[in-house]
Amino acid sequence: MNLEAFVLGCGGMMPLPHRHLTSVLLRREGELFLFDGGEGTQISIRRLNLKWKKITAIFVSHMHADHVTGLPGILMLSSQVDRDEPLYIFGPPKLADYIEQSRRSLDMYINYEIIVSEITEPGIVWKGEGFHVRAFPLRHTKTCYGYAMEEDLRPGAFHPDKAQSMGVPRGPLWSVLQSGNDVRLDDGTVVRPEDVMGPTRSGRKFSYLTDSLYFPDVSREVAGSDLLICEGMFESALLPSAIEKKHMTSAQAATIARDAGSVRKLGLIHYSPRYTERDLKLLLDEARAIFPDTVLTRDRMDFPIEYLD
């Protein structure tokens, strides 16, 4: 089952010619899930040739303009692609009012159902087939949430040699066992899945974390992430500014990834516009000194997320 993350915009605060505002899209077996929708989100979706109508749900971190100004255009354009499925939008207080005011002020033509759910407490906000999305609180200048998409546990690896040694012939019965069901042989012997399969295996996990003051406990929320997309807005020399504005340095993002345990890759995002493309190397170097598997995300960069086993 394919799982892939696309960075639609990597910039923070204001758009630049080469950096749209923060937005990440997750594609899982054809379904699309959008995390934030800053200015320029539509452009990246179009350039990546992604399908508007495949966006099942949108998860908004907080109600600051650089994270939501791309949403009205997405809502309007979704009416032009024969969408007939509801669009679910999750986020903090005032999100529903923003969506409704945008619809009325812009006199939007919407031919599908929009279901907005304002998050009042952390926890699972979306359950899909074989996965869920969980919201966790961050520490910003207003109510803000991070999100983690985590797949369910998978069955263990099937061992054909064990199946054959227990008298289960190659064929459909193997599929029955791999599906988690017992098999009864002609002689009455019952073979159970645990007899021929290894221990359960983890699914994949994607975490999205922006905007927030650094605090150690947040590492627990992203533990085990195959891909962690986390803001790295400032260099360490600007830590006082990061604290004042309730943002993070790239070194703090790397500390979260390191302390979480089992994070496979960290992608920095939400860069301050003060940094040129050349300057961003400083953010990367400071992060890699703490967590080597760190990359600078760029607009329209994609990250395939593979199973470990």
Per-range role (PLM):
Residues F6, F90, I115-T120, R134-F136, ...:
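General small-molecule cofactor/ligand-binding pocket signal
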Residues P122-G123, Y214-D309:
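Binuclear metal-ion centers of metallo-dependent hydrolases, dominated by the metallo-beta-lactamase
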Residues M1-L48, D84-P86, Y147-M149, G156, ...:
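Conserved beta-strand hairpin/beta-sheet module of binuclear metal-dependent hydrolase folds
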Residues F35-G38, I55-M63, G91-P92, S207-S212, ...:
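Active-site neighborhood of phospho(di)ester-bond hydrolases with catalytic His/Asp-centered motifs
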Residues P15-P17, F131-Y208, S212-E221, L227-I229:
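Active-site-proximal loop/helix segment associated with metal-binding centers of metalloenzymes
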Residues R83-L87, P92-E118, R274-T276:
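Active-site neighborhood of divalent metal-dependent phosphoester bond hydrolases
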Residues G70-L77, S102, T276-D285:
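Metal-dependent catalytic neighborhoods of phosphoester/phosphodiester hydrolases
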Residues E39-F90, E118-T120:
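Active-site metal-binding motif and surrounding structural segment of the metallo-beta-lactamase
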